[in-house]
């Protein structure tokens, strides 16, 4: 079933509203979209942060978003999440959507389970929360306080909080950026498992080219407010850094980002 799309008409300036209201939320024969952006523009003062973006993400597709700091990646996430409505253009996003940020953003005065189920209603909410925590490897930690969690555990709670809502669109804004290397590897495996199980469309923001290739079906590069590259990840699974196809794609992405292999290796 195609995900229900939210028409973010309130985000659009008057010249685009009629077009958005008439838009078909499920274009294509028998298919659908989790995200459809056309001509998206975001300006802060005199600074153009996003300049005419077009982006489509299909149900179940995992898209990694790369770009230098300040290129507009987090701004795009905020817009798709409904946190920023000062935009021009057409923005359609799945109604059921969740966001995970680099910081877990847990409420310190609530225990783990209430953090996971925050804002949900229904008699089965607590059980759904426990199931979500078990899925991320935190069964039995329902009554723990956020302050007692490691960085990796806190991000697991954030993932549980996102997935308990069964989103059609899961957005992750550098969720593993503050974690150590070993914890990141474990979180990669967990995310892959959860995505196979729940099958949301994913928009994954990262600075790590290897991480993007390891996880994504497709990689897009944002450069000065525009998409400068959009490529499929044509690397056989299980993906290995030693695979020549992995190395070629890495070189392509690093070149697009203006970083050579030597600089990346010594970073």
Curated annotation (Swiss-Prot):
User: What are the subcellular locations of this protein?
Assistant: Cell membrane
Q: Which GO terms describe its cellular component?
A: plasma membrane
Keyword set for this entry?
ATP-binding, Cell membrane, Membrane, Nucleotide-binding, Translocase, Transport
**Where would one find coiled-coil regions in this protein?**
none
Q: How does this protein lie in the membrane?
A: Peripheral membrane protein
| Entry EC number(s) | 7.6.2.14
Main function: Part of the ABC transporter complex SsuABC involved in aliphatic sulfonates import. Responsible for energy coupling to the transport system.
Family note: Belongs to the ABC transporter superfamily. Aliphatic sulfonates importer (TC 3.A.1.17.2) family.
Q: How does it assemble?
A: The complex is composed of two ATP-binding proteins (SsuB), two transmembrane proteins (SsuC) and a solute-binding protein (SsuA).
* PANTHER family named among the record's database cross-references: ALIPHATIC SULFONATES IMPORT ATP-BINDING PROTEIN SSUB, TAURINE IMPORT ATP-BINDING PROTEIN-RELATED
What is the designated name of this protein? Answer: Aliphatic sulfonates import ATP-binding protein SsuB 1
């Amino acid at each position: 079933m195609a995900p229900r799309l939210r028409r973010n008409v309130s985000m659009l300036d008057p010249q685009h509203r009629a077009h958005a209201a008439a838009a078909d939320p499920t274009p294509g024969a028998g298919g659908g979209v989790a995200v459809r952006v056309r001509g998206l523009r975001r300006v802060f003062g005199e600074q153009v942060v996003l300049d005419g973006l077009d982006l489509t993400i299909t149900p179940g597709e995992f898209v990694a978003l790369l770009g230098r700091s300040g290129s507009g990646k987090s701004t795009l996430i905020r817009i798709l999440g409904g946190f920023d409505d000062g935009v021009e253009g057409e923005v359609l996003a799945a109604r059921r959507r969740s966001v995970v940020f680099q910081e877990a953003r847990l409420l310190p005065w609530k225990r783990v389970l209430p953090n996971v189920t925050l804002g949900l209603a229904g008699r089965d909410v607590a059980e759904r929360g426990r199931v979500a925590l078990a899925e991320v490897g935190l069964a039995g930690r329902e009554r723990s306080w956020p302050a007692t969690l490691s960085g990796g555990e806190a991000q697991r709670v954030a993932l549980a909080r996102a997935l308990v809502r069964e989103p059609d669109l899961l957005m992750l804004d550098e969720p593993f950026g503050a974690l150590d290397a070993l914890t990141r590897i474990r979180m990669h495996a967990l995310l892959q498992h959860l995505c196979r199980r729940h099958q949301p469309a994913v928009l994954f923001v990262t600075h790590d080219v290897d991480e993007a290739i390891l996880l994504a079906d497709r990689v897009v590069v944002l450069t000065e407010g525009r998409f400068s590259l959009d490529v499929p990840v044509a690397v056989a699974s299980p993906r290995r850094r030693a695979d020549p196809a992995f190395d070629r794609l890495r070189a392509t992405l690093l070149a697009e980002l203006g970083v050579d292999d030597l600089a990346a290796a010594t970073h």
